[in-house]
A protein has these predicted regions:
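Canonical Radical SAM [4Fe-4S] cluster-binding loop centered on the CxxxCxxC motif
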Residues: 1-14, 204-207
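Conserved SAM/AdoMet-binding glycine-rich loop
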Residues: 2-5, 17, 21-98
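Short cysteine/histidine-rich metal-coordination sites, predominantly Zn2+-binding motifs
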Residues: 10-20, 248-257
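Active-site beta-loop-alpha junctions enriched in small/polar residues
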Residues: 36-38, 72-76, 102-104, 131-139
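Short, aromatic/basic amphipathic alpha-helical patches
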Residues: 53, 81-90, 110-123, 146-149
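Catalytic-core regions of glycoside hydrolase
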Residues: 85, 89, 97-101, 113, ...
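A C-terminal junction/extension of Radical SAM enzymes
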Residues: 117-210, 251-258
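Flexible mid-to-C-terminal extensions adjoining Fe-S/redox cofactors in radical SAM and related proteins
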Residues: 204-258
Length: 258
C-alpha cells in the first residue's frame, strides 16, 4: 500500500489482490502491510479483511502464512480509524500490529508517547517501536532528506545493501517457495516488496529497480527476473558491499558476479 497517505497514491484492489496471490504463489510465510500509512487508505479495513480470509485457507509445507501491519499510529487521533484498527486486531491471521515512532524523526512522537500504554492495551498483538533507529538505510528517498538525524544514521550505517540477501539467496535456490523459506530463516520477512503500482522490488523502496509487475507479468517471469538480479549500486550502502574484505561478502560478490 506504498504512498498510501492523504496526499499520495493508493493501491487498487486489483493490485492488492494480485500482490496477495503472488505472495501465496511464492510460499511467503509472512505478509507485511505498510505504506505510506496503511490506515490512511480508503479501503484499509476492506483490504485487510480480504487478506485475512484468503490466508485462512492457505497451508504450506513450512506452516500457515500470517500477516503484520506497520503504522505510524496517526489513526489513534481518529475515532473511526481507531475502531477499524480494533476490528482488524481481532483477525486470526494477524501476527502483529506495529506502531513506529522515533524521537526526532516522527512528528507524532510526543503524541504516541502520551498514549503509548493505551495503544498497547488494545491487544497483546500491538507493539510500539520507539527505541532509537534500528537500521536507517539509504534507499533513494532517505538520501535526499535534510533531516540531520537521518543523514547521520545513514552515514554511520555499516550494513550492506537492503537487497543483498534476496539477490544472493535467489541464486542458490531452485524455486520461489524454497527462496521464501530461506529468507524467513534469515529473518527477512519484508522482501520481495510490491509497491502500490504492483511493481516488485528486492528492497523496500520504489526508488529501487523493479523486476516485474504482479498485474501485467506472470509470476514465474517475475521469479526469473528476481533470480537474475544483482544490487544496482545506486544507494550509498553499495560501497560497504563493494569494498568489504569479509570472506562471506567476498564470496557473495563472486556468486553475484560483482
Amino acid at each position: 500500500m506504498q504512498e498510501s497517505t492523504e496526499n499520495g497514491c493508493h493501491m487498487s484492489e486489483q493490485v492488492f489482490a494480485k500482490a496477495v496471490e503472488f505472495g501465496i504463489w511464492s510460499g511467503a510465510l509472512t505478509f507485511n502491510i505498510s505504506g505510506g500509512e496503511p490506515t490512511e487508505h480508503p479501503n484499509f479495513e476492506e483490504f485487510i479483511n480480504l487478506l485475512n480470509v484468503r490466508l485462512s485457507n492457505v497451508y504450506t509445507e513450512f506452516g500457515r502464512p500470517l500477516f503484520t501491519i506497520e503504522s505510524n499510529g496517526e489513526w489513534a487521533r481518529d475515532v473511526r480509524k481507531t475502531n477499524a484498527v480494533k476490528r482488524v486486531l481481532k483477525h486470526k491471521m494477524l501476527a502483529g500490529f506495529q506502531v513506529s515512532s522515533f524521537k526526532g524523526l516522527y512528528k507524532n512522537y510526543d503524541f504516541i508517547q502520551k498514549y503509548k500504554n493505551k495503544i498497547k492495551a488494545l491487544s497483546p498483538r500491538m507493539f510500539i517501536a520507539d527505541e532509537g533507529i534500528i537500521s536507517m538505510q539509504d534507499l533513494g528517498r532517505a538520501s535526499k532528506t535534510d533531516n540531520p538525524a537521518i543523514r547521520k544514521a545513514i552515514s554511520e550505517n555499516r550494513h550492506n545493501v537492503s537487497c543483498l540477501n534476496g539477490c544472493l539467496v535467489s541464486k542458490q535456490t531452485k524455486t520461489m517457495k524454497e527462496l521464501s523459506f530461506g529468507l524467513a530463516k534469515a529473518n527477512q520477512h519484508c522482501k520481495p516488496f510490491v509497491d502500490w503500482k504492483g511493481n516488485v522490488h528486492w528492497s523496500e523502496s520504489i526508488c529501487c529497480p523493479s523486476y516485474g509487475n504482479v498485474v501485467t507479468d506472470d509470476f514465474e517471469t517475475i521469479w526469473q527476473n528476481l533470480k537474475k538480479a544483482v544490487p544496482c549500486g545506486t544507494c550509498s550502502l553499495f560501497k560497504n558491499l563493494k569494498e568489504s574484505k569479509d570472506e562471506k561478502l567476498v564470496l557473495a560478490r563472486m556468486i553475484m558476479g560483482i
